[in-house]
């Protein structure tokens, strides 16, 4: 399907087929090869979506049952399963009219995440913060009707997103990894900066995540890889979704742990023997950070603010003795250049909380000899708190040249 995925190790495969990953083409390959079975859990979302079609054609799907895959992929079935297990999830409804959408929003409040089934133009998903924004999005970008319902979900702000990658056998978790996003929930998992092992989650939160994950694995009788995404705030844990396949973070956590998750998963799916992980293998003295690579600088007038749609064009994974070292390594690997002290750093922050959050960083940079610039409100705040700051107008095409600004820090509001 994607030749680049095997460009460096093409000789590892017995046979390569460069064709579209469609149901018809997969059946053609199956007719030719006559395999013992097929694995659909290591190729992303597209092969996962073929599981039930292959099952109806009596093609043996190795690992987790296609019926279980369908229970996880079908939003209504999965939500009903979570309710049955007593597992919390963000409130959501599938709605067929603007009036119904407004009625649901009246119960849960703004903001809400809107997923249209039929897109007229623009993005497939959008976070709406008020009624005007909601109406404009549904009228301009999507169609709402009985034929084309929209899914509207409660959008939780200032909430941590946590990932649970694991391998299970007959519903029992064999090995797992808990990672956390640096950014708050609302940034696509393909764009978010991932930290493993998780550094800033409560012990009680981690314990609840493990308990919920085991419940889901048992209910779906998972045999193979899976990934569950969680929202967590103040020890309240909600499940976003469960994918019964290897996620994009699978190779990353395997690298950090030095434990090959996908090898274990493959052996389980093939009913082959595998090595049980030692508990000490998960007690590691290193931190991994997976950071995304973006191409905004090459796209004129591209909006660099991240959201629910994926924007990254690549990623890097780095390891350090602690979080700060691993994060710095990852930033440098994505092309970030650390400014020298003789250069200027500029801050632009709207919300008071953001100004307070950057106070320690600005003091440290000032102590290191950096010249501090800021927009009017931010400059007044920093000066009032002992950080000598020069106020400048922004945006200004000449500001970076005249003031020698080599690094701009800005914290846009979610609506910008």
Q: Each PLM stretch: what is its role?
A:
Residues 409-416:
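Conserved small/polar residues in nucleotide/adenosyl-binding loops
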Residues 1-35, 46-48, 55, 60-63, ...:
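ATP-dependent carboxylate activation and anion-phosphoryl transfer catalytic cores
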Residues 18-23, 70-74, 323-329, 349-353, ...:
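A general structural motif
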Residues 1-12, 75-78, 376-381:
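Short, glycine/polar-rich helix-capping loops at beta-to-alpha or helix-loop-helix junctions
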Residues 17-19, 58-65, 386-399:
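Short hydrophobic/aromatic-enriched beta-strand-loop microsegments
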Residues 64-125, 384-393:
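A conserved helix-loop-beta module that forms one wall/lid of the active-site cleft
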Residues 1, 11, 347-348, 354-359, ...:
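Generic long, charged, amphipathic alpha-helical segments
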Residues 36-42:
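Periplasmic-binding protein-like
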């Amino acid at each position: 399907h994607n030749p680049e995925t095997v460009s460096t190790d093409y000789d590892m495969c017995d046979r390569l087929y460069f064709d579209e990953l469609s149901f018809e083409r997969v059946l053609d390959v199956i007719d030719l090869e006559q395999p013992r079975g097929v694995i659909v859990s290591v190729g992303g979302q597209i092969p996962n979506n073929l599981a039930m079609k292959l099952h109806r054609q009596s093609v043996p799907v190795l690992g987790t049952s296609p019926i279980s895959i369908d229970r996880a992929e079908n939003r209504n079935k999965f939500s009903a399963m979570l309710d049955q297990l007593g597992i919390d999830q963000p409130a959501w409804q599938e709605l067929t009219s603007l009036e119904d959408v407004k009625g649901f929003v009246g119960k849960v409040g703004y903001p809400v995440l809107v997923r249209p089934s039929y897109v007229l133009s623009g993005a497939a998903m959008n976070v709406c913060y008020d009624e005007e924004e909601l109406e404009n999005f549904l009228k301009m970008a999507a169609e709402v009707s009985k034929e084309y319902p929209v899914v509207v979900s409660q959008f939780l702000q200032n909430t941590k997103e946590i990932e649970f990658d694991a391998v299970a056998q007959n519903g029992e978790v064999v090995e797992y990894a808990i990672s956390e996003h640096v950014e708050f929930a609302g940034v696509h998992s393909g764009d978010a900066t991932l930290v493993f092992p998780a550094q800033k989650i409560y012990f009680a939160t981690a314990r609840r995540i493990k308990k919920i994950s085991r419940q889901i694995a048992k209910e779906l009788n998972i045999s193979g890889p899976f990934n569950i995404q969680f929202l967590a705030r103040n020890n309240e844990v909600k499940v976003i979704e469960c994918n019964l396949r290897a996620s994009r973070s699978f190779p990353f956590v395997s690298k950090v742990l030095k434990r090959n998750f996908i090898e274990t998963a493959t052996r389980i799916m093939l009913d082959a023997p595998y090595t049980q992980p030692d508990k000490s293998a998960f007690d590691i003295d290193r931190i991994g950070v997976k950071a995304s690579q973006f191409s905004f600088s090459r796209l004129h007038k591209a909006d660099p603010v991240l959201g629910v749609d994926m924007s990254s064009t690549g990623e890097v994974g780095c390891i350090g003795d602690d979080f700060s070292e691993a994060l710095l390594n990852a930033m440098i690997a994505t092309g970030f250049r650390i400014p020298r002290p003789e250069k200027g750093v500029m801050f632009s922050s709207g919300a008071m909380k953001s100004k307070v959050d950057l106070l320690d960083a600005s003091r440290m940079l000032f102590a290191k000899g950096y010249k501090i610039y800021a927009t009017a409100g931010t400059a007044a705040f920093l000066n009032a708190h002992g950080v000598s700051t020069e106020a400048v107008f922004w945006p200004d095409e000449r500001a970076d040249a005249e003031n020698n600004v080599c690094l701009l820090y800005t914290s846009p509001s979610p609506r910008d």
